Amino acid sequence: MDIKRTVLWVIFFMSAVMLYDNWQRDHGRPSMFFPSATHTAPAAAGGASGTGATTTAGDVPAAAAGAAPSTTAPAAQAQLVKFSTDVYDGEIDTRGGTLAKLTLKKQGDGKQPDLYITLFDHTAGHTYLARTGLLGGDFPNHNDVYTQLNPGSTSLTGDQNTLKLSFESPVKGGVKVVKTYTFTRGSYVIGVDTKIDNVGTAPVTPTVYMELVRDNTAVETPMFSHTFLGPAVYTDAKHFQKIDFSDLDKNKANFEKSADNGWVAMVQHYFASAWIPQQGAKRDIYAEKIDPALYRVGVKQPVAAIAPGQSADVQARLFAGPEEERMLEGIAPGLELVKDYGWVTIIAKPLFWLLEKIHGYVGNWGWAIVLLTVLIKAVFFPLSAASYKSMARMKEITPRMQALRERFKSDPQKMNAALMELYKTEKVNPFGGCLPVVIQIPVFISLYWVLLASVEMRGAPWILWIHDLSQRDPFFILPVLMAVSMFVQTSLNPTPPDPVQAKMMKFMPIAFSVMFFFFPAGLVLYYVVNNVLSIAQQYYITRKLGGVKKKPA
């Protein structure tokens, strides 16, 4: 039994360490074993003020080969146009008509009731914005100051379903651009229409670029866990491709460079933004580093030649909001993949589907976690029973095993032969309890990532003192229950004959319990319920086996 338990603990511990380290490296963070350069928070990336953010011509995407470069107009006074809908508070910078600030009014910051998550921002300490412009000539781009058309109400009132804000560029290269943002009630999808008017005397063939620009400042995540932060690309050909900031640093990023479908995104824990061009429109995809700590991902969509006096419309959608899986599935193919489960996606997605169905019946995510854990334990009960039966049989013969070890302690070969004979006589497999446990590990790891990645847990209460399942227990009641359950579970298992192993078995619950003090309450709730059910199962099976043995032959 001591061999089996040792193997299990070693497998579990090493798996946890390697998973954590691989997750670190996979998401651009330093490895515990292979040190690498780390990202630093950006300095003022262009800055922002009441007159709008400033940018330079050098940050305009490269145009197609042979195209004339765009120039920057003389400095002009820009403004920040504030707007408000039922889901957003934001600011549009008239320099470029750039979406420079976006606060999610239905997503609290988890700490103060009157503060909300700000997704887009452009300050001295943080840059994250969405912008567009034209390439292919000396055409308007995101450095030019636009003029708001038809200034008026910039708030979505009670009787409105949509809010439109339009901005007109100066004429450059014989071209004028009118950019219109359309906000819809209850929606995190923003319509972005780019109308290109040829007011010159010669045909023009511009290219529209749409990009997301972000620094590499890390977002807050639960301690001992990291989720992906950076650009992502989706196409029908290559599907979902994450791009590490570290690969952009080295100019080694590998992703699909052209398509007529899909989207580009910036992904972080719980939230994402994505440009979604029209399906069927050919576009080039790019992702690059543009400053010491500033990156961008975007698309360049060519426009057919526009004759003098004619115009062309390029329509796209911009998603900016929480990674709610069902909502994302209805917006664009593959967009739900920004909710990143990593390599356990194939198991995690069905688990979340089931968790969501249970929530639909009980209306509380905490109780949904409890019921899902109960359901999983019920499904795996036959495997757990086999494991506990094996453990019980090993516990029965432990005194005889210890006697054999003492008897042959000077001759390891004879000791091993005697132990194998004992196993054969008693029809006990020392590793019989391992396989059932190993089979269950991927499911429980997947459920861990489901609870960690699901924005639905943010602000979701359970009972009494648990007001947010995505935050740690404020009174540490669940972590204490977790520690107690681990000690009880350990005490039900046979004590290893080796004193060193026995001490290790006592130390491991302490080590893991300390970690759980910093985990989100939803995760700890899952592990507490799982442990309590495991204890009940083990106690029931052990009593049942004991009752059978007491019956007369």
Swiss-Prot record:
The chain crosses the membrane at residues 7-24, 365-385, 435-455, 474-494, 509-529. Keywords: Cell inner membrane, Cell membrane, Chaperone, Membrane, Protein transport, Transmembrane, Transmembrane helix, Transport. It comes from the Bacteria. PANTHER family: CYTOCHROME C OXIDASE ASSEMBLY PROTEIN COX18, MITOCHONDRIAL, OXA1. Its main location: membrane. GO terms for biological process: protein insertion into membrane; protein transport. GO terms for cellular component: plasma membrane. Interacts with the Sec translocase complex via SecD. Specifically interacts with transmembrane segments of nascent integral membrane proteins during membrane integration. It is found in: Cell inner membrane. Required for the insertion and/or proper folding and/or complex formation of integral membrane proteins into the membrane. Involved in integration of membrane proteins that insert both dependently and independently of the Sec translocase complex, as well as at least some lipoproteins. Aids folding of multispanning membrane proteins. It comes from Burkholderia orbicola (strain MC0-3). InterPro entries: Membr_insert_YidC, Membr_insert_YidC_N, YidC/ALB3/OXA1/COX18, YidC/Oxa/ALB_C, YidC_ALB_C, YidC_periplasmic_sf. GO terms for molecular function: membrane insertase activity. It is a multi-pass membrane protein. This is Membrane protein insertase YidC. Belongs to the OXA1/ALB3/YidC family. Type 1 subfamily. NCBIfam families: PRK01318.1-3, yidC_nterm, yidC_oxa1_cterm. Pfam families: 60KD_IMP, YidC_periplas.
